[in-house]
Amino acid sequence: MTDSFAHCASHINYRHKMKTMFIFSTPCCSPSTAFFSPFRASNSKPLRSTLSLRSSISSSSITSTSHCSLAFNIVKHKEKNVVSANMTSSVSSRTFLNAQNEQDVLSGIKKEVEAGTLPASIAAGMEEVYLNYKSAVIKSGDPKANEIVLSNMTALLDRIFLDVKEPFVFEAHHKAKREPFDYYMFGQNYIRPLVDFETSYVGNMPLFIQMEEQLKQGHNIILMSNHQSEADPAIIALLLEMRLPHIAENLIYVAGDRVITVPLCKPFSIGRNLICVYSKKHMLDNPELVDMKRKANTRSRKEMAMLLRSGSQIIWIAPSGGRDRPVANSGEWAPAPFDSSSVDNMRRLVDHSGPPGHIYPLAILCHDIMPPPLKVEKEIGEKRIISYHGTGISTAPEISFSNTTAACENPEKAKDAYTKALYDSVTEQYDVLKSAIHGKKGLQASTPVVSLSQPWK
C-alpha cells in the first residue's frame, strides 16, 4: 500500500478469458515456448498436470524492451498468434525460467544472492516454498508431479525475483493483470495441484448461479466471508471456474496490506482484483503510521463506493479482519468473529450505492493447504507450510438487514444483530464443510440448509 492512489473504474466483462496453457519440452538451456488454447468447461474433473505453467505470456506483441514496464504496466499492442522466445525473455530474468531441474533452481537462488541481486531473507523463503510445494504436490500422487513442481515453481520464483528488482505498487483499486503475463492463470495453475478435488465441495451451487444472474441485471453482490489462508481467492475461483468462470475471474477481494507487500505473496495478489486496505488487527503495529493507514483506508472506501455505483460488482470481504485460527481450548478451527463495524460499513456502502445490492454469507474451508501461524504476528516473514488437501466453499440465501433487525431497539443493537446473523450462517455452513472434508462424510454431510455438490464433475 502506498499514498498514491488512482481511480480505475471497473466494468463487467462477460467475454470469458479463461485460457489453458500447454508446455512443450525444449532442449536444455533453451527458453520455454508457451502456447494458449481456449479453456472449455466440461463435466470432467478440473485438469491438474496439463495446467502447470512455465510462463503465462499472453499472445500479444509487446512494444517495449524494458522488463519492468512490461511486467507491471498495461501497454498498447496488436494481437498476434504466437509468442516468440524473445518476447518471453523480455519480461523475465531467465535465471529461474532456464532451470531444467531442482539443482538448477536452488543454485539459481544461491547465484542471485551471491551477486547481490536477491536479499538472503527472501532467498531463504523462496527455497522453503520450493521444498514445501514439492512435498505437497508429490503427495497428491500425480504421476507428473515433478514436472508440475518445476514448471510452477520456476514461474513463481521468476515473478518474485522480478518484483524484487522492480517492486510492483498496488493502487487502492487493483485490477488483475492479465497481460503481457497472465497473473490470474498463473495463480490458478499454481494452487490447482494442491487441491484434492475428490474431497472438495461447493455448498448451494444454485445460489452462486443466482448471483451471476443478479450481476447480469446490474446488481451488486457482497460476500461476507470467513478468511482461512492466502490461497482463499484461488480456492474460490478453482471451485467455481468450471460452471461460473465470470464470477471466478471478476470477483473483487478486500485485501490487507500484507498480501500486497510480502514478496512471496505479491505475484498471486497481482493476479486478483483487489480493494487494498489496512487491517484493524495491524492498524496500531506502528504508531507513526496510524494516520497514514487511516487516510489510505478512507481512499479505498471511496474507490469501493465508486465501483458499487457502477453496478454489476461482486466483492468478497472478511469482516473478521484477518485469517481464522484454531480455538485455544480445543485446537479446532472455526471462523473468527465478525467485526460489526466492518459489516455495517459495507452494508451502508451497498445501500447507498444506487443499484440493488445483495449480501450473502460465505463459508470457506481451506486452511490445510496454506495454514497461517497459530497466532497473529506483527512481523512479516511467517513460515510457509503447504499441503495437498480437500477444500470447500458454501453460500446461503442473502440476509436482509431490515428483516433481521425489525425488532431491534436502536441502531447499535441492529448492527450487532445483523452481524450475528451473518456470522451464525457462515459458522453453520463451515461445520457442514468440515464434516464433509475432515469428517470424510463427503456429499452425505449435506443438510437441509447446505446442499453439497462437485460442479466440476
UniProtKB/Swiss-Prot annotation:
Its main location: plastid. Its EC number is 2.3.1.15. GO terms for cellular component: chloroplast stroma. Keywords: Acyltransferase, Chloroplast, Lipid biosynthesis, Lipid metabolism, Phospholipid biosynthesis, Phospholipid metabolism, Plastid, Transferase, Transit peptide. Residues 1-88 form a transit peptide. SUPFAM superfamilies: Glycerol-3-phosphate (1)-acyltransferase. The HXXXXD motif is essential for acyltransferase activity and may constitute the binding site for the phosphate moiety of the glycerol-3-phosphate. Belongs to the GPAT/DAPAT family. This is Glycerol-3-phosphate acyltransferase, chloroplastic. The lineage of its organism: Eukaryota, Viridiplantae, Streptophyta, Embryophyta, Tracheophyta.
